[in-house]
Every structure is written in structure tokens, then in C-alpha cells.
């Protein structure tokens, strides 16, 4: 594809002097769940106190996305079901909350026609038909669902027509839209976890794989056969073709039958959980990373010809520094050390270290311990991502924690069932400091955290967090104080590229400090972040240079963009709208 270069000079402000200094007062996160009206959205995932199966433990994802394009982030919370007939027959659904622009949300699930009930798992967002409204994909144990956004506040289930419902027998986990062939139409990747059948699965304590510290617990994933990942190619007519085999995504392959292997267990399939697509090797093509549970994680490198090669082991992002496959849960992607290469953070099981894979351009290295992430080993992490919570220009890390075994809740162990969240601040020198103790009571509050998403829901210039908690209401964490430093938000709109601009890379430079970010669909644990890219600017009054590389190959440059503004940039048309933070 040919690359055009356009430079636009804008009279926003004079060139700024960045001062990436630490704020004098700590940034705190305030739990505004009740005030925002989100308390009724209680998660259902089997029996809260007597879980018998692994399916009941995993919880669901969450999305920050602007479904009605009014400029304000709405919230979608994935919900599960139950094996209790009374609960199952009540048909619990996922939730969609509309942002009222005043700090509150309204439940619009019914009016939006999002009433599918089942064992919901993950979600991802992308405008697959390029009509200007972002569509929603939800994974399930069972039939997956693609909701077409009708543009009038309602959605239509087009899963069967589009050809992405799946077999109805798989356990869909993380997902992401991506334009892997760069034809302008969003394709879809779905990770499948394990082959699970409650009629065949043993109960707690019935196998060596069903005990934890000698306590009978639900079985898995060890002993279960892993699932097979799926890649759907968008035909451009509203339908998708399953190209998993032809593209190489179906490897490693799991068995077709839903079996539990009680002895002589060997990993088979992927055991895929969190998934994220981004350009890890800076060749202009999206690759796919999958966090895998108790098996080597996967990195599918895009070969530019419609196929992928799985290279995680030689690339250095499959195992930990000791060559051990950890129990990967969620995955976040960003350039935390500002060297121009996208890095990966992955949550793991309790008594394992959250893994930080530093991308050095020739592959990845496990930088977890020297970066300071080894201080918290007793937590079981799920949702995770990089975000700049204090607007100092460096990507920090947030982790939503919570154990999976309800059976340990009343035991006097070194571990707890409900767990606090963790916030790491990036020191700008390759190391992180745990600042959870000073980040507010809401961070320290103990929950069963699962999926989490990041975005500026109140449009005040700092990044907020929403967490989908197992067996309870979500937690909406408002960032209070991050905007004492300045920032800009960049919303990209594709024309030659896909309309959601997924895969667009943006580079922002202030003074001698540069940051990169990509528009991504799906990351964290089964979740979707705000498509608008956030760049903290410290004390700068403007971003000196903003460079965009679109999936189409077009490159555009803008100069002197005022801080504390949202800029909407449309491919080939430049800045089509701007708005100061705090305005409506």
C-alpha cells in the first residue's frame, strides 16, 4: 500500500515546555458506583458460596464505549448465568448503561434490545460494517453473539447471518476486532478457553486437579482439553468466513470432544483467555497476543499474506524468565518505557508474579522483577492494563484481583478470596512503585475483580476505571486529581481504513518526550477500553507534534495541539472537531 504524507500546521498554541514532574498530592480513585446508578448491575455467575465448576469462577468483561456517538462513554457489563434452574430461568442478561453526562448512568439494556441470556464471558467493540456506529461482540460458553449497532440506540443480533456464532459448544473467552489483511474491513479473533461439559466434569475433590492446598475446589484448567482459537475474515458484505485453518490461527489445536483427562494429562489446544491485537514488531501489520492459562501464551505474528506464525516462545513472551508457563489471565499493551516498541503486561494466578514483557525490538524479555512487580505475589490478577493515571506522560499499571476458589473464603490461609486492587506508578526509569496505599480506599477495597476497562467517562481529562466484579455489582473508579497535569485525547475516525480506526498508531511528542499508542479492540481480561487515545503531557500546554499512521498506509502530522482538549481526527480530512475537557 502506498503511503501519503500530509503535514497540517495549526495555530492552537506556541510550543510548550514539558515538565514531567510528579504531582504534589497523590491521585486518588473514588468509588462512585452507587452515585452513578450502577449498583443494580449485580453479576451472576453460578452459586456465590458453593461453586462446583470452573465456569462459575471466571466472571465477565466490561466495555467503555460510546455506542450512541454523543461524545460520552457508556458502559456494557457482561453477565453470566447459573446451574440453579430458578436463577437460570429468570434469564439474567448483560447490562448496557447510557452516560447521562452528569456523572450518572441509565440502564438501557431492554430498550437497546440486548436481552440475550447465557454464560457471558468477554466483549470487544468495532464497526465491522463501517456504518459509523460501533458494533458489539460478546463471547459465551456456548453461542457467541454479534450485535449490530443500528444507530438509533438499539442493537440487532446478527450472529447467525454474519457467521460468527460459532459451534455453540465452545467456551469463548477474549476477543478483538482487527484488520489483519488491511483491506479496510474489520476481522474478528476469538480465543477459546477449555472444552467444558458440566455433565462430564468431575466435582470438587474428585481428581488431583480438583484440590487446592488440600481443599476440594472446582476442577481446572489442568486436566481439561484446551480450546482452539478462531479467526474470522470480514468479507465486506456483512458476513465473515472462518479462516482459522488457512491462516494458521487454529494451531495449537484442541480436541473436538469435551473431555476431562484425569490422569496422564498433557496440554492440548490453547487455553486462551485475554487477547489483544497490536503491531508488536513495527512492520505496520497487526499481530495477536493471547494470555493462556497454565500453558505457554501465544504470539501470532502477521506474515502479511493472510497467514500468521505462532512465535511466542522464540520471541520471549510465552513463559516467565525461568522458562515456566504461568496461569495467564489478562493482557495489556502499551509502550511503558517510551522506546517506540509496544510492551505487554499479563496477570497470572496467585503466588505467581504479574509478568511484564519488555519489547526491545528484537523480541521480549521478562522485566517483571527488576521493574518492581514482584512485590505482590499473593493476589490472583484478572483485569489489567497500562494507563497514565497521573498524566505525567508515562504508562502506569492497574490490576483487578480476586481469587477463584470460594472454598478458601473461611479458611485461615495466607491467601484471601476477596482481594484489593493494585496500582503501580511508572517512575519513568523502567521501574514501577506500588502506590495502592495512597490511591484511596476504593483501591484497597476487597472484591472479586474480573474484567476491567479504562476511559475518561466524565470527560475531565484523566482516565477512570470500571471493574466487573464476580457475584456482585461493578466498581466505577473516578480518577480524582490526575488532571492536575495536562493531557490530550485523540479520537481517530477511519475513511480509507476501518471506521473505528483500529490499528491506527499515534505518536505524540512534547519537548524531548515521545509516546506511542494504538487504537485497539479488546484487551485486559475480556474487556474493551475507550477508543480515544489518552496522552498525559505533564505540565505542557501543548503537544508539539502528533503523528498518525493509519492502517491504509496514510501518514499525517499535526503540530502544536493545545493541551486539555479532545481532538477528532478523520483520515484524509484532518481535525474535524475539538473540545476542551469539561465542556459539554
Where are the model-predicted features located?
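Beta-propeller blade signature
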Residues: 95-99, 230-234, 419-426
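Blade-edge beta-strand/turn elements of extracellular beta-propeller
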Residues: 29-31, 104-113, 154-165, 238-250, ...
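Repeat-based blade/solenoid architectures
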Residues: 38-61, 112-124, 164-176, 225, ...
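Hydrophobic beta-strand segments that make up the repeating blades of beta-propeller
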Residues: 72-79, 135-140, 188-192, 287-292, ...
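Beta-propeller blade termini
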Residues: 59-69, 98, 120-133, 148, ...
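Gly/Ser/Thr/Pro-enriched helix-cap/hinge segments flanking short amphipathic alpha-helices
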Residues: 36, 363, 371-372, 414-584
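Short, conserved, GDST-rich strand-edge loop motifs in beta-rich repeat architectures
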Residues: 78-91, 194-223, 400-416
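N-terminal export signals
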Residues: 1-17
Amino acid at each position: 500500500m502506498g503511503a501519503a504524507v500530509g503535514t497540517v500546521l495549526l495555530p492552537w498554541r506556541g510550543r510548550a515546555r514539558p515538565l514531567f514532574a510528579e504531582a504534589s498530592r497523590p491521585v486518588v480513585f473514588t468509588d462512585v458506583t452507587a452515585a452513578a446508578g450502577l449498583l443494580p448491575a449485580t453479576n451472576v455467575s453460578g452459586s456465590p458460596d458453593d461453586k462446583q465448576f470452573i465456569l462459575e469462577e471466571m466472571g465477565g468483561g466490561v466495555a467503555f464505549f460510546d455506542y450512541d456517538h454523543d461524545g460520552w462513554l457508556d458502559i456494557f457489563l457482561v453477565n453470566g448465568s447459573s446451574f440453579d434452574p430458578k436463577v437460570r430461568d429468570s434469564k439474567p442478561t448483560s447490562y448496557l448503561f447510557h452516560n447521562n453526562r452528569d456523572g450518572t448512568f441509565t440502564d438501557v439494556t431492554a430498550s437497546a434490545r440486548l436481552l440475550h441470556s447465557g454464560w457471558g464471558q468477554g466483549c470487544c467493540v468495532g464497526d465491522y460494517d463501517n456504518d459509523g456506529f460501533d458494533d458489539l461482540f460478546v463471547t459465551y460458553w456456548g453461542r457467541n453473539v454479534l450485535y449490530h449497532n443500528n444507530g438509533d440506540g438499539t442493537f440487532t443480533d446478527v450472529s447467525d447471518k454474519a457467521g460468527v456464532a460459532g459451534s455453540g459448544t465452545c467456551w469463548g473467552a477474549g476477543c478483538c476486532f482487527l484488520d489483519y489483511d488491511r483491506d479496510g474491513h474489520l476481522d474478528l479473533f476469538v480465543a477459546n478457553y477449555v472444552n467444558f461439559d458440566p455433565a462430564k466434569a468431575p466435582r470438587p475433590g474428585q481428581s488431583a486437579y480438583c484440590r487446592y492446598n488440600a481443599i476440594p475446589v472446582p476442577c481446572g484448567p489442568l486436566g481439561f482439553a484446551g480450546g482452539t482459537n478462531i479467526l474470522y475474515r470480514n468479507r465486506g458484505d456483512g458476513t465473515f468466513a472462518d479462516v482459522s485453518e488457512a491462516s494458521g490461527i487454529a494451531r495449537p489445536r484442541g480436541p473436538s470432544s469435551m473431555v476431562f483427562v484425569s490422569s496422564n494429562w498433557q496440554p492440548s489446544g490453547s487455553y486462551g483467555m485475554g487477547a489483544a491485537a497490536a503491531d508488536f514488531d513495527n512492520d505496520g501489520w497487526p499481530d495477536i497476543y493471547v494470555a493462556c492459562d497454565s500453558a505457554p501464551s501465544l504470539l501470532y505474528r502477521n506474515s502479511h499474506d493472510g497467514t500468521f506464525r505462532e512465535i511466542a516462545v522464540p520471541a520471549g513472551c510465552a513463559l516467565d524468565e525461568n522458562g515456566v508457563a504461568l496461569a495467564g489471565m489478562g493482557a495489556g499493551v502499551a509502550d511503558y518505557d517510551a522506546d517506540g516498541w509496544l510492551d505487554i503486561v499479563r496477570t497470572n494466578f496467585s503466588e505467581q508474579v504479574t509478568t511484564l514483557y519488555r519489547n526491545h525490538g528484537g523480541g521480549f524479555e521478562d522485566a517483571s522483577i527488576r521493574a518492581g512487580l514482584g512485590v505482590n505475589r499473593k493476589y490472583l490478577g484478572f483485569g489489567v492494563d497500562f494507563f497514565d493515571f497521573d498524566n505525567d506522560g508515562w504508562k502506569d499499571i492497574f490490576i483487578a484481583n480476586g481469587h477463584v476458589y470460594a472454598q478458601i473464603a473461611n479458611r485461615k490461609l495466607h491467601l484471601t478470596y476477596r482481594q484489593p486492587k493494585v496500582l503501580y506508578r511508572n517512575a519513568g526509569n523502567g521501574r514501577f512503585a506500588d502506590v495502592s496505599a495512597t490511591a484511596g480506599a476504593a483501591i484497597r477495597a476487597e472484591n472479586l475483580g474480573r474484567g476491567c476497562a479504562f476511559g475518561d467517562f466524565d470527560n475531565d481529562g484523566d482516565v477512570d476505571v470500571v471493574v466487573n466484579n464476580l457475584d456482585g455489582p461493578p466498581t466505577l473508579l473516578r480518577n480524582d486529581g490526575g488532571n492536575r497535569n495536562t493531557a490530550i485525547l485523540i479520537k481517530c475516525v477511519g475513511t480509507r481504513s476501518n471506521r473505528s480506526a483500529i490499528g491506527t498508531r499515534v505518536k505524540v511528542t512534547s519537548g524531548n518526550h515521545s509516546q506511542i499508542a494504538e487504537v485497539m479492540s479488546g484487551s485486559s481480561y475480556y474487556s474493551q477500553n475507550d477508543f480515544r487515545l489518552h496522552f498525559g503531557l505533564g505540565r505542557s500546554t501543548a503537544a508539539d507534534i502528533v503523528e498518525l499512521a493509519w492502517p491504509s498506509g496514510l501518514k499525517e502530522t499535526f503540530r502544536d495541539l493545545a493541551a486539555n482538549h479532545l481532538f477528532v481526527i478523520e483520515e484524509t480530512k484532518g481535525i474535524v472537531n475539538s473540545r476542551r475537557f469539561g465542556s459539554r
